[in-house]
């Protein structure tokens, strides 16, 4: 079923959200931000993602390597929780409807923010976008920017009455373009059709009407998804519990820590399978010196001597 034209009806709208106010303050405070209501310049993108250690897309968005994204697919939400201790406690969003609960979503965030439509603002936005050489400003403006490995992340302020931002045709385009999927803090439509696609998707509800009564406020800018702050280029990890948005500079650290966890879990279950120990003797960590040594030897074998020594140095830095 085709998605209907992007409407700007002058009817009652949901309350203006605090995130929009904060975004307006943020954009107003950025030097040389005039005319950049829709997206950051490359320089601004680099400034706000300065800790990114990887390559970038032409627009400045961080480009975490595909090889690292493959490793993220082996992670669970619990294994990403370590970023909370690194100053990022607001990177997880839950309470979703999940398109295919057994299929993980991994990719780089391309963000788009919407607000309840206000005609005078929308008219100026559309005119400025046209002056920059853009076409009709709509949700498809952001969708057409997607690259392989991207995740379409849409901040629709959790609204359901404003209709479904994508139906089966646009969902199919997202799937075939990115190979990943979408996170939509709002509604989708054509769920029966979308469910036939082998893609990952997270959304709040499904509803028949097409999107209306909203306007694009920004593309590839910070957005709020649930209780998470999402930056363009964040690595998206969705599993059965919810969605994590991982800052690029922490991705490798998370992956490395998860490898240790996997090895520990493997050893723990091996010991449980022996049927000789109470759970508290093995999990969370063994206390018996012989078992401690056995685990350390197992870890060293799995990691290799060099990586094991590096891990132990980080775990117990010299005083």
Locate the predicted segments by residue:
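N-terminal secretory signal peptides that target proteins for export/translocation
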Residues: 1-15
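Bacterial N-terminal signal peptides
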Residues: 17-29
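Amphipathic alpha-helical packing elements
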Residues: 40, 45-73, 79-80
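Buried hydrophobic positions in well-ordered alpha/beta secondary-structure cores of metabolic enzymes
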Residues: 60, 174, 234-236
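Channel- or pocket-lining gating/hinge segments that regulate access to a cavity or pore
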Residues: 241-244
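Boundary at the C-terminal end of the N-terminal hydrophobic targeting segment
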Residues: 33-35
